[in-house]
């Protein structure tokens, strides 16, 4: 059965960005990172899920490139963690990957990152015990390094 997620209206997009900013604050505090802003990527951008600029500005795509439907919140958090890792390592080398997975693990421990979970508009739940990380990164994580 195909999962149906709504198209994003401006209010929902604003709420997602607010939620990403709150979650980012929890993550950067742990790692001593600083970012300038998190905003939604323009709807027409299809070549990337997110971008981190040298000045600390982060843009995250909230919509699927072809359907325009909301991406799952876990996908947005995955992208957020990836872009936060770029605040320390501006490449995709081994140190970047290790740091990215460390941020992702912390997001999982805080209950922010829940892969396979809820669509973007799902209500925020209380943090739960961290899931055990497998020895291999998930395919969704590796695809970010394409």
What name fits each language-model region?
Residues 1-78, 87-146:
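Active-site-proximal or metal-binding-adjacent scaffold patches in catalytic folds
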Residues 83:
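Walker B catalytic acidic pair
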């Amino acid at each position: 059965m195909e999962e149906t997620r709504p198209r994003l209206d401006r209010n929902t997009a604003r709420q997602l960005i607010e939620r990403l900013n709150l979650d980012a604050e929890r993550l950067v505090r742990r790692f001593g990172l600083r970012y300038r802003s998190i905003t939604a990527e323009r709807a027409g951008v299809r070549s990337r899920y997110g971008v981190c600029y040298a000045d600390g500005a982060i843009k995250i795509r909230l919509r699927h490139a072809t359907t325009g439907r909301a991406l799952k919140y876990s996908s947005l958090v995955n992208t957020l963690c990836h872009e936060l890792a770029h605040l320390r390592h501006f490449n995709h080398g081994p140190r970047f990957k290790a740091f990215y997975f460390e941020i992702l693990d912390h997001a999982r421990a805080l209950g922010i990152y829940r892969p396979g979970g809820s669509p973007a508009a799902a209500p925020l739940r209380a943090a739960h015990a961290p899931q055990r990380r497998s020895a291999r990164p998930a395919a969704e994580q590796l695809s970010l390094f394409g």
